[in-house]
Regions:
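Contiguous beta-strand segments within globular domains
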Residues: 25-71, 169-180, 291-306
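Aromatic-rich carbohydrate-binding modules that target alpha-glucans
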Residues: 87-113, 204-213, 303-349, 362-388
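Basic K/R-rich, polyanion-interacting modules in nucleoproteins and related proteins
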Residues: 265-312, 392-403
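Bacterial Sec-dependent N-terminal signal peptides
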Residues: 1-19
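Long, internal scaffold/assembly segments composed of regular secondary structure
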Residues: 192-275
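Extended low-complexity, serine/threonine- and proline-enriched intrinsically disordered segments
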Residues: 61-90, 188-211, 313-324
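Low-complexity, Pro/Ser/Thr- and charge-rich linker/hinge segments at domain boundaries
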Residues: 150-171, 373-396
Length: 403
């Protein structure tokens, strides 16, 4: 029972890692390492990796935004036992000076962008990092929190997946097995020195934190037939593209101008009773339009109208890497008892979007079904804190796509 409490305690902490937007006038936060838009941002320490951060503010009034970086522990609590000079080379709290006003769009916005490392700062220690953006014109108001990871691959992670699980065989679940090799790092008490996080499609709400290992030996640890590493298989993500406001594109039934804004209508979704074979980006999104030029400030904003035909099945939410509003009700579908359907309207920038319907806890909604064939992506993060160390370092990262 004590171990279960420990896992649940840190499960709640892991949820805090998600990107969040706090201002109603800030939209479309993206954090991309190099060109890997389908993954969360993971940088390798000492490499040439670049983290690109972009967002929009819904006006043509240039604002003074300040970026502050905070180093966090494995559970995303703020690091308190290391100095800023231990992990940051350069200066913190620097202004975001690179911005561009939108061009030929029906919604005015200003696009802001910057990157890490830059002339002001460079990260010099592995671990979890939270980037906070403040609006100086609004009295140092916090408008954005964004997460990123910096890994130094000092340990080796082996990760595999099977649909022949300890619950069922080729039905509704997927089970992971994991092997960790310490390599040159000295581990005496794994319970105190090793911290592991395993996620499905980067969903922090359903992360498995410190699942108990079955085997421990001098050179590593092994997780095999571990029920804590069994995940609901879910179904493929929904997807659509809004590339041109003059006509519908992939996944869009119709798009129209209502006199003041563009309204886009993805095809109505119904209960999924079978596996959907259409591959998607597992919650990722990518801003683009049919012109493919200067997309950062030429893509327009449209109001996307979601409809899910189903009997009432409790609260249902949209979930993707783009659902970053700090208020989760911004993505809650409202039930229409007259027409027996769920509906939501969300303001989104032109581009490709993938998403799923979930419960408030981040689990797949009853409308989606669970099918062993689903091509989920899994992520394993391993942190190390030696007995004399002051902080957790991220020493291993491994991704796996279930095919």
């Amino acid at each position: 029972m004590r171990h279960l409490f420990f896992v649940l305690l840190f499960f709640a902490s892991a949820v805090q890692a998600a990107n969040k937007i706090y201002s109603p006038t800030v939209k479309t936060l993206t954090t991309i390492v190099n060109n890997d838009w389908q993954n969360r941002p993971v940088m390798e320490l000492g490499s040439a990796d670049i983290l690109y951060i972009d967002f929009d503010e819904l006006s043509h009034d240039a604002r003074r935004y300040i970026c502050h970086i905070t180093r966090c522990e494995a559970d995303w609590s703020e690091s308190s036992d290391v100095f800023e000079s231990d992990w940051l080379q350069g200066f913190n709290d620097y202004p975001i000076d690179d911005y561009q006003h939108s061009l030929n769009t029906t919604v005015n916005y200003t696009h802001y962008s910057f990157q890490i490392p830059n002339e002001q700062c460079r990260i010099r220690m592995s671990g979890n990092y939270r980037l906070t953006i403040y609006d100086e014109d609004m009295g140092h108001e916090k408008v954005i929190d964004a997460e990123f990871y910096v890994v130094e691959p000092l340990m080796t992670i082996g990760l595999s997946m099977t649909t022949n699980t300890d619950i069922d065989v080729n039905k509704s679940h997927q089970q992971l097995a994991m092997i960790l090799e310490y390599k040159d790092l000295k581990v005496i008490h794994p319970d105190d020195e090793i911290y592991t996080v395993v996620m499905q499609n980067w969903n922090e709400q359903t992360a498995r934190v410190n699942p108990p290992s079955n085997y421990r030996y001098q050179l590593g640890m092994k997780w095999d037939h571990q029920r804590d590493l069994i995940f609901d298989a879910g179904n493929e993500y929904h997807k659509f593209e809004v590339l041109d406001v003059s006509h519908p594109t992939m996944g869009i039934d119709r798009i129209m101008w209502d006199g003041s804004r563009y309204q886009a209508y993805p095809f109505t979704t119904t209960l999924r009773r079978n596996y959907l074979t259409d591959k998607s980006a597992n919650g990722a999104f990518f801003i683009r339009n049919s012109n493919s030029t200067e997309i950062d400030y030429t893509c327009d904003y449209v109001w996307v109208n979601y409809q899910l035909d189903a009997p009432y099945l409790g609260e249902i939410f949209l979930l993707g890497q783009w659902t970053t509003n700090a208020d989760p009700t911004a993505y809650q579908l409202q039930y229409d008892a007259t027409n027996l359907c769920y509906r939501a309207q969300v303001m989104q920038k032109q581009g490709y979007y993938s998403y799923q319907y979930t419960t408030r806890e981040g689990l797949s909604a009853p409308t989606e079904g669970n099918f062993f064939q689903t091509r989920n992506k899994y992520q394993a993060l391993v942190y190390y804190k030696g007995l004399s160390d002051r902080t957790w370092r991220l020493v291993g990262y491994r991704g796996l796509e279930a095919l």
